[in-house]
Regions:
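Gram-positive cell-envelope targeting signals
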Residues: 1-66
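N-terminal maturation segment of proteins
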Residues: 48-622
Length: 622
Protein backbone atom coordinates (compact mmCIF):
# COMPACT_ATOMS: atom_id res chain seq x y z
CA UNK A 1 0.00 0.00 0.00
CA UNK A 2 0.96 3.62 -0.16
CA UNK A 3 3.28 5.01 2.41
CA UNK A 4 1.34 7.05 4.96
CA UNK A 5 3.46 8.61 7.60
CA UNK A 6 1.19 9.56 10.46
CA UNK A 7 1.55 11.27 13.75
CA UNK A 8 -0.41 11.84 16.90
CA UNK A 9 -0.54 15.10 18.83
CA UNK A 10 1.60 14.22 21.82
CA UNK A 11 1.25 17.41 23.80
CA UNK A 12 -0.02 15.80 26.94
CA UNK A 13 -0.86 17.74 30.14
CA UNK A 14 1.94 16.70 32.48
CA UNK A 15 1.09 16.56 36.18
CA UNK A 16 -1.30 19.44 35.77
CA UNK A 17 -5.07 19.71 35.44
CA UNK A 18 -6.43 21.15 32.23
CA UNK A 19 -9.83 22.26 31.07
CA UNK A 20 -12.12 19.30 30.35
CA UNK A 21 -12.26 19.96 26.65
CA UNK A 22 -8.48 19.73 26.41
CA UNK A 23 -8.09 16.47 28.31
CA UNK A 24 -9.02 13.79 25.85
CA UNK A 25 -7.55 15.15 22.66
CA UNK A 26 -4.07 13.89 23.48
CA UNK A 27 -4.88 10.25 24.10
CA UNK A 28 -5.90 8.75 20.79
CA UNK A 29 -3.17 6.38 19.68
CA UNK A 30 -2.41 6.60 15.99
CA UNK A 31 -0.29 4.49 13.75
CA UNK A 32 3.32 5.01 13.02
CA UNK A 33 3.85 4.12 9.45
CA UNK A 34 1.97 2.06 6.92
CA UNK A 35 4.92 0.99 4.83
CA UNK A 36 4.89 0.93 1.10
CA UNK A 37 3.95 -2.76 1.06
CA UNK A 38 1.57 -2.87 3.98
CA UNK A 39 -0.95 -4.86 1.99
CA UNK A 40 1.18 -7.93 2.55
CA UNK A 41 2.59 -7.16 5.98
CA UNK A 42 6.32 -6.94 5.81
CA UNK A 43 9.23 -5.71 3.80
CA UNK A 44 11.72 -7.12 1.35
CA UNK A 45 10.12 -10.52 1.13
CA UNK A 46 7.49 -10.62 -1.53
CA UNK A 47 7.35 -12.53 -4.79
CA UNK A 48 10.22 -13.47 -7.02
CA UNK A 49 13.41 -15.37 -6.32
CA UNK A 50 16.49 -13.54 -7.49
CA UNK A 51 19.03 -15.31 -9.67
CA UNK A 52 22.41 -13.59 -9.56
CA UNK A 53 24.04 -13.11 -12.97
CA UNK A 54 27.65 -14.31 -12.97
CA UNK A 55 28.84 -13.33 -16.41
CA UNK A 56 29.69 -15.52 -19.37
CA UNK A 57 32.14 -17.74 -17.54
CA UNK A 58 29.91 -20.12 -15.59
CA UNK A 59 32.85 -21.37 -13.55
CA UNK A 60 33.40 -17.94 -11.95
CA UNK A 61 33.56 -17.93 -8.15
CA UNK A 62 33.06 -14.95 -5.87
CA UNK A 63 36.80 -14.50 -5.50
CA UNK A 64 37.31 -14.57 -9.28
CA UNK A 65 34.71 -11.90 -9.99
CA UNK A 66 36.24 -8.50 -10.59
CA UNK A 67 35.29 -5.59 -8.39
CA UNK A 68 33.53 -3.89 -11.30
CA UNK A 69 31.54 -7.01 -12.20
CA UNK A 70 30.57 -7.58 -8.57
CA UNK A 71 29.27 -4.05 -8.26
CA UNK A 72 27.32 -4.34 -11.51
CA UNK A 73 25.81 -7.64 -10.41
CA UNK A 74 24.80 -6.17 -7.08
CA UNK A 75 23.18 -3.19 -8.78
CA UNK A 76 21.13 -5.56 -10.94
CA UNK A 77 20.21 -7.60 -7.88
CA UNK A 78 18.84 -4.68 -5.85
CA UNK A 79 17.14 -3.26 -8.93
CA UNK A 80 15.30 -6.56 -9.38
CA UNK A 81 14.34 -6.59 -5.71
CA UNK A 82 12.91 -3.11 -6.14
CA UNK A 83 10.93 -4.04 -9.25
CA UNK A 84 9.57 -7.22 -7.64
CA UNK A 85 8.44 -5.30 -4.60
CA UNK A 86 6.74 -2.39 -6.30
CA UNK A 87 4.93 -4.63 -8.78
CA UNK A 88 3.53 -6.86 -6.04
CA UNK A 89 0.31 -4.83 -6.03
CA UNK A 90 -1.12 -1.88 -7.89
CA UNK A 91 -1.31 0.51 -4.95
CA UNK A 92 2.36 0.06 -4.13
CA UNK A 93 3.32 0.59 -7.76
CA UNK A 94 1.17 3.69 -8.11
CA UNK A 95 2.49 5.26 -4.92
CA UNK A 96 6.14 4.44 -5.67
CA UNK A 97 6.62 5.37 -9.32
CA UNK A 98 5.17 8.02 -11.57
CA UNK A 99 7.12 6.83 -14.61
CA UNK A 100 7.56 3.07 -14.89
CA UNK A 101 9.42 2.96 -18.20
CA UNK A 102 12.98 3.43 -16.82
CA UNK A 103 12.47 0.23 -14.85
CA UNK A 104 11.05 -1.69 -17.82
CA UNK A 105 7.85 -2.33 -15.91
CA UNK A 106 5.01 -3.24 -18.20
CA UNK A 107 1.36 -2.60 -17.46
CA UNK A 108 0.16 -5.23 -15.02
CA UNK A 109 -3.26 -6.44 -14.03
CA UNK A 110 -4.93 -4.71 -11.10
CA UNK A 111 -3.93 -6.36 -7.85
CA UNK A 112 -4.18 -5.75 -4.12
CA UNK A 113 -1.56 -8.36 -3.31
CA UNK A 114 -2.31 -11.21 -0.96
CA UNK A 115 -2.90 -11.74 2.75
CA UNK A 116 -3.10 -14.70 5.09
CA UNK A 117 -0.86 -17.43 6.44
CA UNK A 118 -0.03 -18.91 3.03
CA UNK A 119 0.98 -15.49 1.69
CA UNK A 120 3.20 -14.89 4.71
CA UNK A 121 4.85 -18.29 4.35
CA UNK A 122 5.58 -17.57 0.71
CA UNK A 123 7.07 -14.25 1.78
CA UNK A 124 9.36 -16.02 4.23
CA UNK A 125 10.45 -18.38 1.48
CA UNK A 126 11.37 -15.41 -0.69
CA UNK A 127 13.19 -13.78 2.24
CA UNK A 128 15.25 -16.91 2.69
CA UNK A 129 16.17 -17.00 -1.00
CA UNK A 130 16.98 -13.31 -1.11
CA UNK A 131 19.22 -13.63 1.91
CA UNK A 132 21.04 -16.53 0.28
CA UNK A 133 21.45 -14.52 -2.92
CA UNK A 134 22.65 -11.47 -0.99
CA UNK A 135 25.33 -13.46 0.77
CA UNK A 136 26.86 -14.61 -2.53
CA UNK A 137 28.32 -11.14 -3.03
CA UNK A 138 31.87 -10.45 -1.90
CA UNK A 139 31.27 -7.60 0.53
CA UNK A 140 34.70 -5.98 0.26
CA UNK A 141 34.23 -5.44 -3.50
CA UNK A 142 31.05 -3.39 -3.10
CA UNK A 143 30.93 0.40 -3.08
CA UNK A 144 30.26 2.17 0.21
CA UNK A 145 26.64 2.79 -0.77
CA UNK A 146 26.21 -0.84 -1.77
CA UNK A 147 27.72 -1.99 1.52
CA UNK A 148 25.16 0.13 3.35
CA UNK A 149 22.31 -1.41 1.35
CA UNK A 150 23.79 -4.87 1.89
CA UNK A 151 23.96 -4.35 5.67
CA UNK A 152 20.41 -3.01 5.87
CA UNK A 153 18.91 -5.74 3.70
CA UNK A 154 20.75 -8.52 5.48
CA UNK A 155 19.58 -7.33 8.88
CA UNK A 156 15.98 -6.88 7.78
CA UNK A 157 15.77 -10.18 5.92
CA UNK A 158 17.06 -11.99 8.99
CA UNK A 159 14.47 -10.18 11.10
CA UNK A 160 11.75 -11.28 8.70
CA UNK A 161 12.76 -14.90 9.16
CA UNK A 162 12.43 -14.53 12.94
CA UNK A 163 8.67 -14.24 12.46
CA UNK A 164 8.31 -17.79 11.11
CA UNK A 165 6.78 -19.11 14.34
CA UNK A 166 4.70 -16.00 14.98
CA UNK A 167 2.69 -15.57 11.78
CA UNK A 168 -0.66 -16.23 13.43
CA UNK A 169 -0.10 -13.20 15.67
CA UNK A 170 -0.10 -10.84 12.69
CA UNK A 171 -2.96 -8.34 12.71
CA UNK A 172 -4.19 -6.78 9.48
CA UNK A 173 -6.87 -4.75 11.24
CA UNK A 174 -6.38 -1.96 13.72
CA UNK A 175 -8.14 1.12 14.99
CA UNK A 176 -5.65 3.41 13.27
CA UNK A 177 -2.96 1.34 11.55
CA UNK A 178 -5.27 -1.31 10.14
CA UNK A 179 -5.88 -1.79 6.44
CA UNK A 180 -9.55 -0.90 6.84
CA UNK A 181 -8.57 2.45 8.37
CA UNK A 182 -5.88 3.30 5.83
CA UNK A 183 -7.57 2.13 2.64
CA UNK A 184 -9.92 5.11 2.14
CA UNK A 185 -7.03 7.59 2.15
CA UNK A 186 -4.89 5.36 -0.04
CA UNK A 187 -7.70 5.12 -2.58
CA UNK A 188 -8.47 8.82 -2.37
CA UNK A 189 -4.84 9.70 -3.09
CA UNK A 190 -4.33 7.07 -5.80
CA UNK A 191 -2.48 8.96 -8.52
CA UNK A 192 -4.17 9.46 -11.86
CA UNK A 193 -1.09 10.05 -14.02
CA UNK A 194 -2.78 8.52 -17.06
CA UNK A 195 -6.09 7.16 -18.24
CA UNK A 196 -4.73 3.68 -17.56
CA UNK A 197 -4.36 4.61 -13.88
CA UNK A 198 -8.05 5.49 -13.73
CA UNK A 199 -8.96 2.14 -15.27
CA UNK A 200 -6.70 0.27 -12.84
CA UNK A 201 -8.22 2.15 -9.91
CA UNK A 202 -11.72 1.12 -10.91
CA UNK A 203 -10.58 -2.49 -11.26
CA UNK A 204 -9.08 -2.34 -7.77
CA UNK A 205 -12.44 -1.39 -6.28
CA UNK A 206 -13.87 -4.67 -7.56
CA UNK A 207 -11.14 -6.63 -5.78
CA UNK A 208 -11.80 -5.23 -2.31
CA UNK A 209 -14.59 -7.67 -1.33
CA UNK A 210 -12.40 -10.72 -1.98
CA UNK A 211 -9.45 -9.06 -0.29
CA UNK A 212 -11.50 -8.27 2.80
CA UNK A 213 -12.92 -11.80 2.75
CA UNK A 214 -9.38 -13.17 3.10
CA UNK A 215 -8.86 -10.91 6.10
CA UNK A 216 -12.16 -12.06 7.57
CA UNK A 217 -11.11 -15.70 7.15
CA UNK A 218 -7.82 -14.89 8.83
CA UNK A 219 -9.70 -13.34 11.76
CA UNK A 220 -11.95 -16.40 12.01
CA UNK A 221 -8.86 -18.59 12.28
CA UNK A 222 -7.42 -16.30 14.92
CA UNK A 223 -10.66 -16.71 16.83
CA UNK A 224 -10.36 -20.51 16.65
CA UNK A 225 -6.75 -20.29 17.82
CA UNK A 226 -7.68 -18.10 20.80
CA UNK A 227 -5.90 -15.07 19.33
CA UNK A 228 -8.82 -12.83 18.38
CA UNK A 229 -8.73 -9.18 19.42
CA UNK A 230 -10.44 -7.81 22.52
CA UNK A 231 -14.10 -6.82 22.35
CA UNK A 232 -13.14 -3.19 22.91
CA UNK A 233 -10.83 -3.19 19.89
CA UNK A 234 -13.32 -5.06 17.72
CA UNK A 235 -16.09 -2.62 18.58
CA UNK A 236 -13.88 0.37 17.81
CA UNK A 237 -13.14 -1.04 14.35
CA UNK A 238 -16.81 -1.87 13.80
CA UNK A 239 -17.84 1.67 14.72
CA UNK A 240 -15.17 3.07 12.44
CA UNK A 241 -16.35 1.01 9.47
CA UNK A 242 -19.97 1.98 10.07
CA UNK A 243 -19.07 5.65 10.16
CA UNK A 244 -17.16 5.42 6.89
CA UNK A 245 -20.07 3.79 5.01
CA UNK A 246 -22.88 5.65 6.78
CA UNK A 247 -23.65 7.84 3.76
CA UNK A 248 -23.29 5.39 0.90
CA UNK A 249 -24.67 7.60 -1.87
CA UNK A 250 -22.45 10.51 -0.83
CA UNK A 251 -19.41 8.52 0.26
CA UNK A 252 -16.07 10.27 0.62
CA UNK A 253 -14.54 8.21 -2.18
CA UNK A 254 -17.32 9.24 -4.54
CA UNK A 255 -16.77 12.94 -3.89
CA UNK A 256 -12.99 12.71 -4.20
CA UNK A 257 -13.15 10.72 -7.44
CA UNK A 258 -15.63 13.14 -9.01
CA UNK A 259 -13.32 16.04 -8.21
CA UNK A 260 -10.22 14.29 -9.58
CA UNK A 261 -11.93 13.19 -12.79
CA UNK A 262 -13.31 16.65 -13.48
CA UNK A 263 -9.77 18.04 -13.19
CA UNK A 264 -8.17 15.32 -15.31
CA UNK A 265 -7.13 16.70 -18.69
CA UNK A 266 -7.79 14.92 -21.95
CA UNK A 267 -11.13 13.26 -21.24
CA UNK A 268 -14.27 13.94 -23.23
CA UNK A 269 -17.49 14.89 -21.45
CA UNK A 270 -18.83 11.43 -22.20
CA UNK A 271 -15.78 9.77 -20.66
CA UNK A 272 -15.98 11.94 -17.55
CA UNK A 273 -19.65 11.10 -17.13
CA UNK A 274 -19.00 7.40 -17.68
CA UNK A 275 -16.14 7.28 -15.20
CA UNK A 276 -18.14 9.10 -12.54
CA UNK A 277 -21.07 6.74 -12.99
CA UNK A 278 -18.84 3.64 -12.92
CA UNK A 279 -17.04 4.76 -9.78
CA UNK A 280 -20.27 5.43 -7.92
CA UNK A 281 -21.62 2.01 -8.87
CA UNK A 282 -18.42 0.30 -7.74
CA UNK A 283 -18.19 2.18 -4.44
CA UNK A 284 -21.79 1.28 -3.61
CA UNK A 285 -21.59 -2.19 -5.17
CA UNK A 286 -18.17 -3.38 -4.00
CA UNK A 287 -16.45 -1.14 -1.43
CA UNK A 288 -19.37 -0.48 0.89
CA UNK A 289 -20.53 -4.14 0.86
CA UNK A 290 -16.94 -5.17 1.68
CA UNK A 291 -16.94 -2.92 4.74
CA UNK A 292 -20.40 -4.20 5.68
CA UNK A 293 -19.17 -7.78 5.45
CA UNK A 294 -16.13 -6.99 7.58
CA UNK A 295 -18.39 -5.33 10.14
CA UNK A 296 -20.69 -8.36 10.23
CA UNK A 297 -17.77 -10.76 10.64
CA UNK A 298 -16.21 -8.80 13.48
CA UNK A 299 -19.60 -8.53 15.17
CA UNK A 300 -20.05 -12.29 14.96
CA UNK A 301 -16.57 -12.88 16.41
CA UNK A 302 -16.99 -10.50 19.34
CA UNK A 303 -16.84 -12.41 22.58
CA UNK A 304 -14.46 -15.06 21.24
CA UNK A 305 -11.34 -13.20 22.32
CA UNK A 306 -9.88 -14.86 25.41
CA UNK A 307 -7.45 -12.10 26.38
CA UNK A 308 -8.71 -8.62 27.30
CA UNK A 309 -5.20 -7.46 28.17
CA UNK A 310 -1.88 -7.05 26.35
CA UNK A 311 0.11 -9.36 24.08
CA UNK A 312 1.86 -11.14 26.93
CA UNK A 313 -1.49 -12.74 27.77
CA UNK A 314 -0.98 -15.05 24.78
CA UNK A 315 1.35 -18.07 24.69
CA UNK A 316 3.94 -16.48 22.40
CA UNK A 317 2.84 -12.92 23.07
CA UNK A 318 6.03 -11.72 24.75
CA UNK A 319 8.15 -13.12 21.94
CA UNK A 320 5.92 -11.46 19.37
CA UNK A 321 6.14 -8.15 21.22
CA UNK A 322 9.94 -8.37 21.20
CA UNK A 323 9.77 -8.99 17.46
CA UNK A 324 7.42 -6.04 16.92
CA UNK A 325 9.59 -3.63 18.88
CA UNK A 326 12.74 -4.71 17.07
CA UNK A 327 11.22 -4.45 13.59
CA UNK A 328 9.31 -1.23 14.24
CA UNK A 329 12.13 0.70 15.92
CA UNK A 330 15.31 -0.43 14.19
CA UNK A 331 16.89 -0.65 17.64
CA UNK A 332 18.73 -3.66 19.02
CA UNK A 333 18.05 -2.78 22.67
CA UNK A 334 16.32 -5.47 24.71
CA UNK A 335 12.95 -4.70 26.29
CA UNK A 336 14.64 -4.52 29.70
CA UNK A 337 17.21 -2.04 28.39
CA UNK A 338 14.47 0.05 26.82
CA UNK A 339 12.41 -0.01 30.01
CA UNK A 340 15.40 1.11 32.09
CA UNK A 341 16.18 3.82 29.54
CA UNK A 342 12.62 5.13 29.75
CA UNK A 343 12.73 5.28 33.55
CA UNK A 344 15.95 7.26 33.35
CA UNK A 345 14.60 9.71 30.76
CA UNK A 346 11.36 10.28 32.70
CA UNK A 347 13.35 11.00 35.84
CA UNK A 348 15.71 13.37 34.02
CA UNK A 349 12.89 15.26 32.31
CA UNK A 350 10.88 15.55 35.53
CA UNK A 351 13.88 16.87 37.42
CA UNK A 352 14.65 19.39 34.70
CA UNK A 353 11.07 20.63 34.53
CA UNK A 354 10.84 20.95 38.29
CA UNK A 355 13.97 23.09 38.32
CA UNK A 356 12.68 25.39 35.58
CA UNK A 357 9.34 25.82 37.33
CA UNK A 358 10.98 26.39 40.73
CA UNK A 359 13.52 28.88 39.40
CA UNK A 360 11.08 30.67 37.09
CA UNK A 361 7.41 30.15 38.05
CA UNK A 362 6.31 32.53 35.32
CA UNK A 363 7.75 30.17 32.72
CA UNK A 364 5.23 27.52 33.69
CA UNK A 365 2.25 29.87 33.38
CA UNK A 366 3.58 31.16 30.08
CA UNK A 367 3.89 27.59 28.80
CA UNK A 368 0.21 27.02 29.59
CA UNK A 369 -0.86 29.94 27.41
CA UNK A 370 1.29 29.53 24.34
CA UNK A 371 0.40 31.48 21.25
CA UNK A 372 2.28 30.25 18.23
CA UNK A 373 3.22 32.70 15.46
CA UNK A 374 0.96 30.88 12.98
CA UNK A 375 -2.07 28.62 13.25
CA UNK A 376 -2.87 28.39 9.55
CA UNK A 377 -1.21 25.18 8.24
CA UNK A 378 0.02 26.68 4.98
CA UNK A 379 1.48 29.74 6.69
CA UNK A 380 3.11 27.49 9.27
CA UNK A 381 4.75 25.37 6.57
CA UNK A 382 6.02 28.46 4.75
CA UNK A 383 7.50 29.80 7.99
CA UNK A 384 9.17 26.50 8.86
CA UNK A 385 10.57 26.07 5.35
CA UNK A 386 12.53 29.29 5.85
CA UNK A 387 13.33 28.81 9.53
CA UNK A 388 15.10 25.46 9.10
CA UNK A 389 17.78 26.88 6.81
CA UNK A 390 20.00 27.91 9.71
CA UNK A 391 20.54 24.48 11.28
CA UNK A 392 19.58 22.05 8.52
CA UNK A 393 21.17 21.38 5.11
CA UNK A 394 19.79 23.19 2.11
CA UNK A 395 16.84 21.77 0.21
CA UNK A 396 15.43 23.15 -3.01
CA UNK A 397 12.72 25.78 -2.64
CA UNK A 398 10.90 24.10 -5.53
CA UNK A 399 9.41 21.51 -3.19
CA UNK A 400 5.62 21.91 -3.13
CA UNK A 401 3.15 20.85 -0.47
CA UNK A 402 -0.59 20.57 -0.95
CA UNK A 403 -2.52 20.87 2.32
CA UNK A 404 -5.74 18.85 2.40
CA UNK A 405 -8.34 18.21 5.07
CA UNK A 406 -9.59 14.87 6.35
CA UNK A 407 -13.16 14.02 5.40
CA UNK A 408 -15.62 14.07 8.29
CA UNK A 409 -16.33 10.34 7.92
CA UNK A 410 -12.67 9.59 8.71
CA UNK A 411 -11.92 12.22 11.36
CA UNK A 412 -12.42 9.93 14.35
CA UNK A 413 -9.90 7.37 13.11
CA UNK A 414 -7.15 9.63 11.76
CA UNK A 415 -4.56 11.78 13.47
CA UNK A 416 -4.38 15.59 13.72
CA UNK A 417 -2.06 15.64 10.72
CA UNK A 418 -0.20 13.19 8.50
CA UNK A 419 2.17 13.20 5.55
CA UNK A 420 1.83 11.14 2.39
CA UNK A 421 5.14 9.99 0.95
CA UNK A 422 5.24 10.82 -2.79
CA UNK A 423 6.57 8.67 -5.62
CA UNK A 424 10.36 8.39 -5.72
CA UNK A 425 10.46 10.07 -9.14
CA UNK A 426 8.00 12.78 -8.14
CA UNK A 427 9.22 13.69 -4.66
CA UNK A 428 8.91 17.43 -5.26
CA UNK A 429 5.11 17.18 -4.97
CA UNK A 430 3.92 16.46 -1.45
CA UNK A 431 0.64 16.20 0.45
CA UNK A 432 -0.09 16.81 4.12
CA UNK A 433 -3.53 16.13 5.58
CA UNK A 434 -4.96 18.16 8.45
CA UNK A 435 -7.74 16.75 10.62
CA UNK A 436 -10.30 19.48 11.28
CA UNK A 437 -12.05 17.47 13.97
CA UNK A 438 -13.38 19.56 16.84
CA UNK A 439 -11.34 17.45 19.27
CA UNK A 440 -8.07 18.83 17.85
CA UNK A 441 -7.08 22.40 18.63
CA UNK A 442 -5.50 23.63 15.41
CA UNK A 443 -4.18 26.73 17.16
CA UNK A 444 -1.71 24.37 18.87
CA UNK A 445 -0.77 22.41 15.75
CA UNK A 446 2.48 24.27 15.03
CA UNK A 447 4.87 21.57 16.26
CA UNK A 448 2.71 18.81 14.80
CA UNK A 449 3.13 20.44 11.40
CA UNK A 450 6.87 20.68 12.09
CA UNK A 451 6.78 16.90 12.60
CA UNK A 452 5.01 16.41 9.26
CA UNK A 453 6.68 19.09 7.13
CA UNK A 454 9.86 21.03 7.97
CA UNK A 455 12.16 19.79 9.39
CA UNK A 456 10.11 16.57 9.76
CA UNK A 457 8.83 13.93 7.36
CA UNK A 458 8.48 16.04 4.22
CA UNK A 459 11.93 17.59 4.61
CA UNK A 460 13.60 14.30 5.58
CA UNK A 461 12.02 12.37 2.71
CA UNK A 462 12.72 15.04 0.12
CA UNK A 463 16.28 15.64 1.28
CA UNK A 464 17.11 11.95 1.09
CA UNK A 465 15.42 11.65 -2.31
CA UNK A 466 17.47 14.62 -3.54
CA UNK A 467 20.67 12.64 -2.87
CA UNK A 468 19.59 10.22 -5.62
CA UNK A 469 19.72 7.02 -3.57
CA UNK A 470 19.22 3.58 -5.08
CA UNK A 471 15.49 3.00 -5.72
CA UNK A 472 15.55 -0.03 -3.43
CA UNK A 473 16.00 2.32 -0.48
CA UNK A 474 12.46 3.59 -1.06
CA UNK A 475 10.98 0.23 -0.09
CA UNK A 476 13.08 -0.08 3.07
CA UNK A 477 11.04 1.30 5.90
CA UNK A 478 12.47 1.76 9.39
CA UNK A 479 9.72 3.29 11.51
CA UNK A 480 12.13 4.16 14.31
CA UNK A 481 14.24 6.25 11.95
CA UNK A 482 11.37 8.09 10.25
CA UNK A 483 9.23 8.65 13.34
CA UNK A 484 12.28 9.24 15.51
CA UNK A 485 13.30 12.01 13.13
CA UNK A 486 9.73 13.30 13.02
CA UNK A 487 9.69 13.54 16.81
CA UNK A 488 13.11 15.18 16.81
CA UNK A 489 11.74 17.72 14.32
CA UNK A 490 8.63 18.27 16.42
CA UNK A 491 10.69 19.08 19.48
CA UNK A 492 12.87 21.36 17.38
CA UNK A 493 9.67 23.09 16.38
CA UNK A 494 9.37 24.67 19.82
CA UNK A 495 12.56 26.60 19.11
CA UNK A 496 11.57 27.43 15.54
CA UNK A 497 8.37 28.99 16.87
CA UNK A 498 10.29 31.87 18.40
CA UNK A 499 9.22 31.06 21.97
CA UNK A 500 11.19 32.11 25.02
CA UNK A 501 14.00 29.56 25.27
CA UNK A 502 13.04 28.45 28.79
CA UNK A 503 9.44 27.98 27.68
CA UNK A 504 10.62 25.94 24.69
CA UNK A 505 12.83 23.82 26.95
CA UNK A 506 9.96 23.17 29.35
CA UNK A 507 7.63 22.13 26.53
CA UNK A 508 10.34 19.96 24.99
CA UNK A 509 11.04 18.10 28.24
CA UNK A 510 7.32 17.72 28.85
CA UNK A 511 6.84 16.09 25.45
CA UNK A 512 9.81 13.78 25.99
CA UNK A 513 8.45 12.72 29.37
CA UNK A 514 5.02 12.14 27.87
CA UNK A 515 6.38 9.98 25.06
CA UNK A 516 8.38 7.95 27.56
CA UNK A 517 5.28 7.44 29.69
CA UNK A 518 3.41 6.14 26.65
CA UNK A 519 6.25 3.76 25.84
CA UNK A 520 6.40 2.63 29.47
CA UNK A 521 2.67 1.97 29.33
CA UNK A 522 3.14 -0.02 26.12
CA UNK A 523 5.80 -2.23 27.69
CA UNK A 524 3.83 -2.55 30.91
CA UNK A 525 0.63 -3.67 29.20
CA UNK A 526 2.10 -5.82 26.43
CA UNK A 527 5.23 -7.27 28.02
CA UNK A 528 5.03 -7.03 31.80
CA UNK A 529 1.39 -8.03 32.09
CA UNK A 530 -0.09 -4.85 33.57
CA UNK A 531 -3.87 -4.88 33.67
CA UNK A 532 -5.89 -1.68 33.63
CA UNK A 533 -5.70 -1.22 37.40
CA UNK A 534 -1.92 -1.48 37.47
CA UNK A 535 -1.56 0.94 34.56
CA UNK A 536 -3.95 3.38 36.21
CA UNK A 537 -1.93 3.26 39.42
CA UNK A 538 1.29 3.93 37.51
CA UNK A 539 -0.09 6.83 35.47
CA UNK A 540 -1.92 8.37 38.40
CA UNK A 541 1.37 9.48 39.93
CA UNK A 542 1.92 11.63 36.84
CA UNK A 543 -1.49 13.28 36.97
CA UNK A 544 -3.47 11.05 34.61
CA UNK A 545 -7.13 10.51 35.42
CA UNK A 546 -8.79 7.09 35.48
CA UNK A 547 -10.62 7.89 32.24
CA UNK A 548 -7.39 8.92 30.54
CA UNK A 549 -5.66 5.76 31.76
CA UNK A 550 -8.50 3.65 30.35
CA UNK A 551 -8.09 5.23 26.92
CA UNK A 552 -4.34 4.62 27.02
CA UNK A 553 -4.83 1.02 28.14
CA UNK A 554 -7.28 0.28 25.32
CA UNK A 555 -4.91 1.89 22.83
CA UNK A 556 -1.94 -0.20 23.93
CA UNK A 557 -3.99 -3.40 23.77
CA UNK A 558 -5.37 -2.51 20.33
CA UNK A 559 -2.06 -1.65 18.65
CA UNK A 560 1.00 -2.93 20.52
CA UNK A 561 4.34 -1.15 19.99
CA UNK A 562 2.71 1.75 18.13
CA UNK A 563 4.42 4.37 20.28
CA UNK A 564 7.83 2.72 20.36
CA UNK A 565 9.12 4.12 17.01
CA UNK A 566 8.31 7.67 18.12
CA UNK A 567 9.87 7.35 21.55
CA UNK A 568 12.77 4.95 21.07
CA UNK A 569 13.52 6.32 17.61
CA UNK A 570 13.85 9.82 19.04
CA UNK A 571 15.97 8.65 21.97
CA UNK A 572 18.31 6.82 19.58
CA UNK A 573 18.77 9.96 17.45
CA UNK A 574 19.26 12.11 20.56
CA UNK A 575 21.93 9.69 21.80
CA UNK A 576 23.69 9.79 18.43
CA UNK A 577 23.70 13.58 18.57
CA UNK A 578 25.05 13.56 22.13
CA UNK A 579 27.75 11.06 21.22
CA UNK A 580 28.84 13.05 18.16
CA UNK A 581 28.91 16.28 20.15
CA UNK A 582 31.04 14.77 22.91
CA UNK A 583 33.52 13.14 20.52
CA UNK A 584 33.88 16.14 18.22
CA UNK A 585 33.86 18.85 20.87
CA UNK A 586 34.47 22.23 19.25
CA UNK A 587 34.44 20.56 15.82
CA UNK A 588 30.78 19.57 16.23
CA UNK A 589 28.57 21.51 13.83
CA UNK A 590 24.85 20.88 14.22
CA UNK A 591 24.03 21.37 10.55
CA UNK A 592 26.68 18.82 9.59
CA UNK A 593 25.27 16.28 12.04
CA UNK A 594 21.80 16.79 10.59
CA UNK A 595 23.24 16.34 7.10
CA UNK A 596 24.86 13.05 8.12
CA UNK A 597 21.63 11.64 9.61
CA UNK A 598 19.53 12.76 6.66
CA UNK A 599 22.00 11.57 4.02
CA UNK A 600 22.32 8.06 5.40
CA UNK A 601 18.54 7.62 5.18
CA UNK A 602 16.31 5.08 6.93
CA UNK A 603 18.44 2.34 8.49
CA UNK A 604 18.72 0.35 11.73
CA UNK A 605 20.43 2.41 14.39
CA UNK A 606 23.40 0.10 14.94
CA UNK A 607 24.25 0.50 11.26
CA UNK A 608 23.87 4.28 11.52
CA UNK A 609 26.08 4.35 14.61
CA UNK A 610 28.81 2.38 12.84
CA UNK A 611 28.75 4.83 9.91
CA UNK A 612 28.70 7.79 12.27
CA UNK A 613 31.90 6.63 13.95
CA UNK A 614 33.58 6.68 10.53
CA UNK A 615 32.09 10.11 9.82
CA UNK A 616 33.44 11.41 13.14
CA UNK A 617 36.89 10.00 12.38
CA UNK A 618 36.78 11.80 9.05
CA UNK A 619 35.90 15.12 10.67
CA UNK A 620 38.66 14.76 13.27
CA UNK A 621 41.28 13.86 10.67
CA UNK A 622 40.66 17.00 8.61
Amino acid sequence: MGNIVKKEDYRYPYRQKREKENKTKHFKVLCTIVCVIALVSGILYQKGIIVIPTGNNKTDTREERSTEDTQEDFSRFIQQVFVDEVTDNSITLNYTLKNKSPYEIEETEASLGDVGIDAMRESLFVSENRLASLETFEYKKLTDEQKLIYDIMKKMLKQNLESSELLEYTEYLGVTSGIQAQLPILLAEYNFYSKEDIDTYLELLKLIPDYFMKIENFERQKSKDGLFMSDTTAQAIIDQCKEFISHSSDNYLIKVFDNKINKFKGLSEEEVSSYIDTNKKEITGYVIPAYESLTDTLTSLKGTGVNPNGLCGYKKGKKYYEYLVKTKTGSDHSIKEINDMLDKKIKQASKYMSKIITDSPDIYYESQNIKYPYDDPKETINHLQKAVKKDFPELSDNISCDVKYVDKSLQDSLSPAFYLTPAVDNYENNVIYINNSAKYDLSKIFTTIAHESYPGHLYQNCYFASTNPSPVRSIINIDGYTEGWGTYAELYGYYLAGLDRKVAELLEKNTIATLCLYAKSDIGVNYLGWDYKKLEKYLNQYGFSAAQSRIIFDSMVAEPASYMPYTLGYLEIADLKKDASEKLGSDFILKDFHKFILSIGPAPFDIIEERMDKWIDGVISK
